[in-house]
């Protein structure tokens, strides 16, 4: 065999080996969520996707499925459990039945503002919740802002404590949330987000409660008249991964994944306040009647729901709740 043919054969063989090795090393993960494409959390996941590929030189990439492409929040949690997807980004309430300790950051009227809320979740409180999630097979990758939740309804403006009486309000599957609305005399109903629009349109529900950004992206203004700024709960979005699938990644890829997600979470938090204000203004412009809650009524609502803290302590113990209250003080 000529020297040229031997050299050419060696180059071809080397190229094949390198291509095979590169292919074997490349991995792709899938992450699913129920937030619309327009929501800041979904945009943040696209930042994560780009950053992850850049950090790993394309050796670890991600496919992102927002807007319930792979099902709703419950289905996404089940998919993480089964290993069908690497992770999900969802409101923490959808994990609270698996990890009830998450309700410790769902206390009514607990946070004065988003800065205080993130001070708490970024403290030892977050570490304690992460440990509880890990026990159930979930690795926490970060907490984004879902935001202050506000009530909409079709019955009447909410200008007093009495105005909440008897309202059929859709809630998330979070027992602390449900108990809080029972305490103010409302009739809360847990329901998946997919059914809420039609339920309000048909009069099965009087209203619902969500951050302004969700009310806007779900177009609830089309079937709701009255908008308020109750801000009764501050809600987080947790990015949770399958412990088994996360641990199957190399140490370098785990580090890259966490670093990419940290950048995405920081970006989303920086945009959330702007998104919140813009969404509220858009809802009012669309024709909703906006009635701000007075300081006096807010104080009455807080007083009416104060017993929820004691009930939750009986359910999950005092340690995490006391840690939350300590950070708040």
List the model feature ranges, each with a label.
Residues 9-19:
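Bacterial N-terminal signal peptides
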């Amino acid at each position: 065999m000529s020297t040229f043919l031997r050299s050419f054969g060696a180059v071809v063989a080397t190229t094949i080996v390198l291509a095979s090795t590169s292919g074997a090393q490349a991995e792709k993960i899938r992450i699913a969520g129920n937030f619309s494409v327009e929501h800041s959390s979904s945009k943040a996941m696209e930042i994560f996707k780009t950053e992850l590929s850049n950090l790993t030189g394309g050796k670890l990439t991600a496919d992102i499925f927002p807007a319930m492409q792979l099902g709703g929040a419950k289905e996404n949690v089940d998919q993480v459990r089964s290993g069908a997807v690497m992770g999900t980004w969802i409101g923490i309430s959808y994990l609270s039945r698996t990890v009830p300790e998450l309700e410790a950051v769902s206390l009514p009227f607990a946070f004065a503002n988003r800065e205080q809320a993130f001070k708490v979740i970024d403290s030892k409180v977050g570490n304690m919740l992460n440990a509880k999630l890990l026990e159930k097979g979930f690795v926490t990758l970060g907490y984004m802002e879902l935001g202050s939740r506000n009530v909409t309804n079709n019955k009447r403006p909410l200008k007093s404590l009495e105005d909440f009486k008897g309202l059929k309000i859709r809630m998330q599957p979070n027992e602390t949330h449900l108990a809080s609305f029972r305490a103010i005399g409302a009739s809360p109903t847990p329901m998946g987000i997919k059914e809420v629009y039609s339920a309000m349109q048909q009069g099965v529900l009087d209203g619902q409660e969500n951050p302004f950004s969700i009310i806007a992206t779900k177009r609830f203004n089309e079937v709701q008249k009255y908008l308020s700024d109750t801000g009764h709960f501050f809600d987080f979005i947790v990015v949770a991964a399958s412990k088994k699938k996360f641990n199957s990644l190399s140490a370098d890829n785990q580090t890259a994944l966490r670093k990419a997600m940290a950048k995405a979470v920081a970006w989303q938090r920086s945009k959330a306040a702007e998104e919140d204000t813009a969404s509220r203004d858009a809802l009012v412009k669309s024709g909703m009647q906006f009635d701000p809650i007075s300081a006096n009524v807010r104080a009455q609502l807080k007083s009416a729901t104060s017993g929820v803290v004691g009930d939750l302590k009986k359910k999950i113990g005092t340690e995490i709740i006391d840690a939350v209250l300590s950070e708040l003080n």
